[in-house]
């Protein structure tokens, strides 16, 4: 019988040959969970232990969800889409992707949803890339001071609460006080900069509509289109009928689109209309996810909700290209209460606020800006020198006017100086009124405010102020066009320019006709009569002689 012999070297060689020739087949690995509870735009999912915060999850049917709560054995998820067909027990898959949106110049002139998908029926958008919604804001060393003006075209704002590129300026007020109109005017006023073709002047705009009616959003689109401003504007729409998750992420989508241009050395402006509705949507989501409620039932991190959004607005350093992202958040108050929770939060985050009052609006003062409570913490740094020189007295004159107006309501007798102050204040208030969607260029603003603050309008009746202003500005453009050119080119208001303005307004007053039909400047004043030629009544004093009886006493 043959004896079986085992040779170890043969076994070793066979194993080595097998290992060398082995080719591993790549198998797809996928994490799958299932829906435990669903309802009210929220789903609780189990079985996905490696899910990341803000990761996108995919439900059956392609609906996406955003992972917000990462708990032991369970995930709280916000459904971004139609939740009707999501049921308990359905499979949920990880995508491995953090929430991001496409960005690029292709978004200009388009209307998109908070996920960056076009909803205007104009076809797909060619994106230049994607940008995560949750990115760190620029650090302190990556920024530089705000010093370039961003003109809104609104006299009251550009003169008293100036906005600079990279600033965050809050627009706050009750409903129906003109908050959206102020923001839309600021977008429309960038039209000339866009037409110049100069990237250093151009400002690309993003308008984020949160929780608004679709008809209102349609009106905004039409207004921008008619004004020629839609070509450089992107609209991110999260209407009132959308799930709370869309209203929550819409502002971050708008800022991500604007940040793309900022980091490419360009200038952008983003309007958040309005953050009150985003806070309410976040409160609803947090309560449904059973997060602990705080003041007014808002979650404890509602301040961080807005601070991490608005801190992205910045003026980048020259090393990073010098781009900027300017933010105009809008907050709606109730009964002019700016001391409520969300308003005070956003006021403390931003670089100033423009407070619109319903009382002023109802009085016909539009834009209804309350000069006393409105402020810009950037101030004169974001103004051209010409505007800074003429607007210095404007805020003081208006503040004194409001104080005297309240005092005179009691019927007290006022001295001549006070009456003059009231008269000039009334004319300044009339001068700052402005029609909707009719922004003023900076040179026309400078000339208009110069005329008001230097007393050149004191002899013009209040009811004729706006007509006088419009006709005078057109007159300067026709006959003294060099004045506008000098302001645009130098940004200063020198002595020679002031002399030209004084002669121009004197010349214009001679031909201006009041609404009463009279000339503003009379042809020739009658000569005063000599005092000797004036007939005067002489009073003779007669002294009565005392009688004898009186003398005896």
From Swiss-Prot:
This protein's UniProt keywords: ATP synthesis, ATP-binding, Cell membrane, CF(1), Hydrogen ion transport, Ion transport, Membrane, Nucleotide-binding, Translocase, Transport
EC number: 7.1.2.2
Swiss-Prot/TrEMBL site (Required for activity) positions: 374
InterPro entries noted in UniProt: ATP_synth_asu-like_sf (IPR023366), ATP_synth_asu_C (IPR000793), ATP_synth_asu_C_sf (IPR038376), ATP_synth_F1_a_nt-bd_dom (IPR033732), ATP_synth_F1_asu (IPR005294), ATPase_a/bsu_AS (IPR020003), ATPase_F1/V1/A1_a/bsu_N (IPR004100), ATPase_F1/V1/A1_a/bsu_N_sf (IPR036121)
Region annotated Disordered, chain positions: 527-553
Subcellular localization(s) per the UniProt record: Cell membrane
Keyword Kinase appears in the UniProt entry: no
Compositional bias annotation for Basic and acidic residues: 533-553
Any GO molecular function: ATP binding
Top-level enzyme category: translocase
Function: Produces ATP from ADP in the presence of a proton gradient across the membrane. The alpha chain is a regulatory subunit.
Subunit structure and binding partners: F-type ATPases have 2 components, CF(1) - the catalytic core - and CF(0) - the membrane proton channel. CF(1) has five subunits: alpha(3), beta(3), gamma(1), delta(1), epsilon(1). CF(0) has three main subunits: a(1), b(2) and c(9-12). The alpha and beta chains form an alternating ring which encloses part of the gamma chain. CF(1) is attached to CF(0) by a central stalk formed by the gamma and epsilon chains, while a peripheral stalk is formed by the delta and b chains.
HAMAP family: ATP_synth_alpha_bact (MF_01346)
Protein name stated in the entry: ATP synthase subunit alpha
Species of origin: Parafrankia sp. (strain EAN1pec)
Gene assigned in the entry: atpA
């Amino acid at each position: 019988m043959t004896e079986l012999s085992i040779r170890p070297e043969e076994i070793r060689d066979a194993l080595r040959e097998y290992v060398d020739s082995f080719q591993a087949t790549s198998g797809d690995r996928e994490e799958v969970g299932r829906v435990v509870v669903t309802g009210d735009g929220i789903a609780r999912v189990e079985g996905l232990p490696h899910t990341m915060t803000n990761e996108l999850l995919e439900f059956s049917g392609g609906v996406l969800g955003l992972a917000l709560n990462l708990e032991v054995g369970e995930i709280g998820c916000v459904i971004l889409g139609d939740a009707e067909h999501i049921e308990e027990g359905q499979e949920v898959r990880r995508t491995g992707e953090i929430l991001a949106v496409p960005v690029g110049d292709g978004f200009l002139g388009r209307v998109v949803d908070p996920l960056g998908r076009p909803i205007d029926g104009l076809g797909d958008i060619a994106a230049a890339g994607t940008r995560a919604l949750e990115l760190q804001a620029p650090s302190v060393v990556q920024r530089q001071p705000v010093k370039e003006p961003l003109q809104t075209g609104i006299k009251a704002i550009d003169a008293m609460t100036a906005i600079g590129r990279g600033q965050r300026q809050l627009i706050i007020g009750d409903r129906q006080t003109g908050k959206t109109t102020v923001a839309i005017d600021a977008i429309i006023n960038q039209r000339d900069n866009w037409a110049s073709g100069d990237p250093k002047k151009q400002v690309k705009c993003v308008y984020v509509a949160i929780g608004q009616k679709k008809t209102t959003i349609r009106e905004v689109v039409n207004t921008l289109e008619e004004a020629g401003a839609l070509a450089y504007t992107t609209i991110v729409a999260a209407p009132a009928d959308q799930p709370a998750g869309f209203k929550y992420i819409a502002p971050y989508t708008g800022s991500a689109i604007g940040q793309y241009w900022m980091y490419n050395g360009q200038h952008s402006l983003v309007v958040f209309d309005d953050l009150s509705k985003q806070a309410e949507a976040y409160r609803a989501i947090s309560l449904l996810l059973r997060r602990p409620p705080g003041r007014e039932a808002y979650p404890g991190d509602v301040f961080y909700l807005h601070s991490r959004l608005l801190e992205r607005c910045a003026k980048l350093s020259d090393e990073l290209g010098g781009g900027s992202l300017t933010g105009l958040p809008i907050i709606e108050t109730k009964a002019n209460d700016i001391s409520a929770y969300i308003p005070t939060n956003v006021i403390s985050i931003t670089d100033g606020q423009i407070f619109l009052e319903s009382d002023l609006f109802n009085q016909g003062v539009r834009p209804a800006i309350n000069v006393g409570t409105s402020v810009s913490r950037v101030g004169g740094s974001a103004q051209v020198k010409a505007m800074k020189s003429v607007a210095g007295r404007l805020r003081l004159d208006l503040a004194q006017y409001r104080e005297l107006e309240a005092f005179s309501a009691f019927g007290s007798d006022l001295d001549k100086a006070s009456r003059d102050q009231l008269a000039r204040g009334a004319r300044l208030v009339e001068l700052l009124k402005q029609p909707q969607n009719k922004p003023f260029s900076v040179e026309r603003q400078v000339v208009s405010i110069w005329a008001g603050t230097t007393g050149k309008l004191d002899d013009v009746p209040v009811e004729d102020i706006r007509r006088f202003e419009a006709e005078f500005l057109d007159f300067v453009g026709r006959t003294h066009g060099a004045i506008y050119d000098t302001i645009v080119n130098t940004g200063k208001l020198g002595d020679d320019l002031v002399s030209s303005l004084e002669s121009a307004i004197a010349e214009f007053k001679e031909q201006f006709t009041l609404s009463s039909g009279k000339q503003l400047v009379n042809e020739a004043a009658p000569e005063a009569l000599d005092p000797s030629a004036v007939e005067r009544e002489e009073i003779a004093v007669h002294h009565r002689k005392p009688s004898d009886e009186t003398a005896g006493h």
